[in-house]
């Protein structure tokens, strides 16, 4: 496990890690520090951090769970009831059907407006999911990850410990729900419309997106380079030529 770039302790190499077009890792990391310093913005991982964390999940079941959270923005409860039947991987545009736990608990077919379709835009993930299902051959209507929240957290803690033992450290505390926040931020970094992300993430209230977009307000303010410091001597010379106010 010596081929992974340490994410926090190699500043000379972090610019090599891709985030999104026109965005480097060092800048994105700095923005995250600012945005999360008050606690108003949820903690999230950047794409290279997620890639590294998944690298330290050798168990394919663990790996595919967190890869699914990362690729879809699912809530933990939603992922717990996902079945092979939820996925459509063969079409030109693969996707997954996402139901809330409350909807799944009801009998009968759920209303169409309570089924969320999330496109799977990363072909590598789609191929991994196909390969995993072929290998494990799960029943089509059997949940893929019917485990407790505590079990999911333990799987994640094991990966974090493996990473730290290999010299890879994360500057935020990572939980399963962190992957949902990370998905939303990753989509924003790739300039997807807020309303589209809101729909894909299953947020009913548009205001729920504001906690994420404030990161980009910080970025915009930083790039404006608005000067506030002037030459006091020159200013005094100019003001001296003006008539006094009556």
From Swiss-Prot:
Q: Which residues form the active site?
A: 75, 102, 177, 180, 203, 212 (o-(3'-phospho-dna)-tyrosine intermediate)
**Which GO BP terms sit in this record?**
DNA integration; DNA recombination
Q: Which Pfam family, giving just one, matches this sequence?
A: Phage_integrase
MF annotations from Gene Ontology? DNA binding
- Metal-binding as a keyword? no
PROSITE patterns, alphabetized: TYR_RECOMBINASE
- The keyword Cytoplasm is annotated on this UniProt entry: no
Q: Boundaries of each Tyr recombinase domain copy?
A: 40-225
The protein's superkingdom reads Bacteria
Q: What UniProt keywords are attached to this protein's entry?
A: DNA integration, DNA recombination, Plasmid, Repressor, Transcription, Transcription regulation
Q: Which family does it belong to?
A: Belongs to the 'phage' integrase family.
Could you tell me what this protein is called? Probable site-specific recombinase in afa region
The species is Escherichia coli
GN (gene name): int
């Amino acid at each position: 496990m010596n081929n992974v770039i340490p994410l926090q302790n190699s500043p000379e190499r972090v610019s090599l890690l891709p985030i999104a077009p026109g965005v480097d890792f060092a800048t994105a990391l700095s923005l995250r520090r600012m945005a999360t310093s008050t606690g108003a913005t949820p903690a999230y991982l950047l794409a290279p951090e997620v890639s590294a964390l998944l690298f330290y999940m050798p168990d394919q079941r663990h790996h595919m769970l967190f890869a699914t959270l990362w690729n879809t923005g699912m809530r933990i409860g939603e992922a717990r009831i996902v079945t092979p039947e939820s996925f459509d991987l063969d079409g030109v545009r693969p996707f997954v059907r996402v139901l809330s736990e409350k909807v799944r608990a009801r009998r009968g077919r759920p209303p169409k407006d309570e089924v969320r379709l999330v496109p799977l835009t990363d072909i590598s993930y789609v191929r991994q999911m196909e390969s995993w299902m072929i290998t494990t051959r799960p029943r089509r209507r059997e949940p893929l990850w019917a485990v407790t929240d505590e079990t999911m957290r333990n799987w994640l803690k094991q990966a974090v410990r493996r990473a730290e033992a290999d010299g890879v450290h994360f500057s935020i505390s990572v939980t399963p729900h962190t992957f949902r926040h990370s998905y939303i931020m990753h989509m924003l970094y790739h300039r997807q419309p807020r309303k589209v992300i809101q729909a894909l993430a299953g947020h009913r209230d548009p205001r729920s997106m504001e906690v994420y977009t404030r990161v980009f307000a910080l970025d915009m303010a930083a790039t404006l380079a608005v000067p506030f410091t002037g030459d006091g001597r020159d200013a005094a010379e100019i003001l001296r030529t003006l008539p006094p106010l009556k």
